[in-house]
Amino acid sequence: MGRPQRADKQRRETDGPQKSRPSLTQAQKNSTTIRIHSDDHDQGRPNTNGYARQEQHAWEDASLHSLDFRLCHSSNLEDDEMHGTATDDMIPVNFDFVSPQVPHAMSDLGMYDFGSEATASDLLDPEPCAQFISLASHSAADHVEKATAERPGNDGSSSPSSSLLRTSSSPSQQAVEKLSDLNVQIHRQLTTDHGSLDSAGRRTQLSCAVVSMIEGLKTFRELLFDILSTTSRSPLQAAFRDGQNNGTSRPNTAASQNMQQHRRSGSMLSLSDCDAVSLSNSNSDSRPFQEGSHHFGCLDMSTSLLLLSCYANLILLCREVFAAIRRALPISGHQSTLLELSGFRIGSVAVQEDSDLQITILIQVVVRLIDGIGHCLGYPYSSTTERGEASPSDRGISLELLDLVLGPKGRQGQPSHIGQIEALREDIRNLSKIVYKSI
């Protein structure tokens, strides 16, 4: 008997009982392929180590069989045993360990952390997310007010300083707009009504011109004081700072009373219509613009130029009105013919029968208004205050700008604004000489 041949061993293994085992895995197929190639390569050499090779192949088959693992729901498995119930060692092939679930809509972004699993129901009906704060719907002032209201010790009521910050610029802006409208009206009246006071219907025209002049001066003075009072160095605020410096927290009542006197003095002339001009009862000894000190801060350039422009136009209007009154007075008998000023009243006393008294009152009223306006501007040239007497704190407009705009010198042969004021005073003096009766 010789050595058992390989063919006999393979025949015995084939004739033996068939064992149920799974199909060859990919690793076993690769091992078989490598073994076949190795056998083909060794065909030229004598097979002297057949039993060793058989044992090595058997050990490799046993090792690979112990490392087999099953995949559930796999379609390439032919054995029916692999379609049974899944056990703990089965791994689902549709599980993704790395990639997160991608949301189906942009609104789902941020709902699930990286690597977490979201079901289809979660994506279709997500849980409510935290509300986002819209920056456009809330202004910075709203956040400041909310933070101030939530501050400890704050009862929700706005402090005087906060209300002052919210409303300090509103009156000034409204006053500037009204001043601009007044300047346009006066300029239009100067350009369109020039020479109409000498026409045939001069009585009505002169009466309307007088009313416009007084109303313009009174409105300008009120707006001027409103604008100056809103600056950082208004009389009330200066008195409040002085009270704090002196150790008192209450503002000076004298400055407040002075402001009220300025307000009341603006209503000295109450003009009902174009045919009736009434004067309220006023004390001749009280001079609100000359009593006390006014601490006004310098205004900005645009507001200062607007004030000076309107003031210059008012001076020109006053000159034309007084020149028309002077021309309306005849050489003789002017007391019975000048009926345009018949609406003046002092309290309940009517003076319509004496035109000289009417003109005298009109002159005094205009002079008072012009002096008060000049004193507030800080460049008075008035009959009661000379230039340079006002302190820098009393000027609402810088002296350099006043000299530049009003200036002592005119341009292109025209008199300067200061020259216009002096010419107006000269016209008033000449008119006073005519209507004044010495006692």
Swiss-Prot record:
Record protein name field: Transcription factor pydF
Biased composition (Basic and acidic residues): 1-18, 143-153
Protein's gene: pydF
Subcellular location: Nucleus
UniProt biased composition (Polar residues): 20-35, 243-260
One cellular component (GO) term of this entry: nucleus
Source taxon at top rank: Eukaryota
Keywords annotated in UniProt: Nucleus, Transcription, Transcription regulation, Virulence
UniProt function note: Transcription factor; part of the gene cluster that mediates the biosynthesis of pyrrocidines, fungal natural products containing a macrocyclic para-cyclophane connected to a decahydrofluorene ring system that show potent antibiotic activities toward Gram-negative bacteria.
Native species: Acremonium sp
Keyword Membrane part of the UniProt annotation: no
Residue numbers spanned by region Disordered: 1-53, 143-177, 239-262
Membrane-spanning residues: none
Bias type Low complexity, positions: 157-172
